[in-house]
Amino acid sequence: MASGTAVVTGGNSGLGLETVRAMAARGAVSDLVVACRDVSRGQAAVDSVATGATRLHVAELDLASLDSVRAFPAVIDALGVPPIVAVVCNAGVQVIGGTRLSQDGIEETFAVNVLGHFALVKLLLHHLAAQARVIFISSGTHDPALKTGMPNPRYAGAADLAKGLGPDDLDGGALGRFRYTTSKLCDVYLAYEFAKRYPMSGESGPTLVVSAMDPGLMAGSGLARDYGVLSRFVWRRVLPRLSRFIKGASTTEASGADVARLATDPAFAEESGLYYIGTTPSPSSVLSYDQFNAVDLWNTCATLAGIDP
């Protein structure tokens, strides 16, 4: 077994938990840190994982709180784990029932899906091994060309997204879904920008292998927790039975295995700044290559988090 630590945000349920299971089964890291808001629920989830020789740790991390994110490097220090070789930025929310703000006054979808992960990776840089892998879990919904049925993302500036502002023609649930798809576009921007700023062959400073990944439509996962009763029933009970007939559909188990491969398999250590559908390198959306937007997002996140760009 290779020595090294992997950190999985939201590793206590859904795709995150299946990623933890798959990583433990692969035995490619010596230590796995399940980073989640509720430590007791995280421990209960971890207790269900067959670990083999991999040591599992549960650590508190609330991505909706910048104070919690800032405290996380000290949590890693206290665990005494080896250097981090992989960070899976998986935790995410889709808020449909109106606008919710984080502890820092940031719209919650942006706070958790984008800003929190930006700050986490930046603050962990000096805990990372050379050429550590960083994976941002994105979504095919970021690409209008795929016609997923979700509102198309639009980028008018990260400052507006942080305030919860959106297109005038959207409200209610549609606005919440727009915030989600746009947050997934932002995750691709972050992946490309981290890859550019911390190249894997850099001569000084941290060196990273960064990617964004579309895990596919995983019906039955916890992503629909904010939907109404009927929609949750369809998502959890009906759609999983129809997944094999839906283009781009997957399961949390299959996608978790894909994430584990991207994070630990030597075959995916050769190139940084890629977008994957599953484990297949693929083009991301046309809008995701907009450098002006990527830099605006980076600088805005740095300002909001109080971190040097």
Task: Place the predicted regions along the sequence by residue.
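Rossmann-fold NAD(P)H-dependent dehydrogenase/reductase core
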Residues: 1-222, 307-308
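Juxtamembrane loop segments immediately following a transmembrane helix
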Residues: 92, 156-162, 227-229, 275-281
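C-terminal amphipathic/interface module of NAD(P)-dependent oxidoreductases
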Residues: 286-309
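Surface-exposed beta-strand-to-loop junctions
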Residues: 100-102, 169-172, 236-238, 276-280
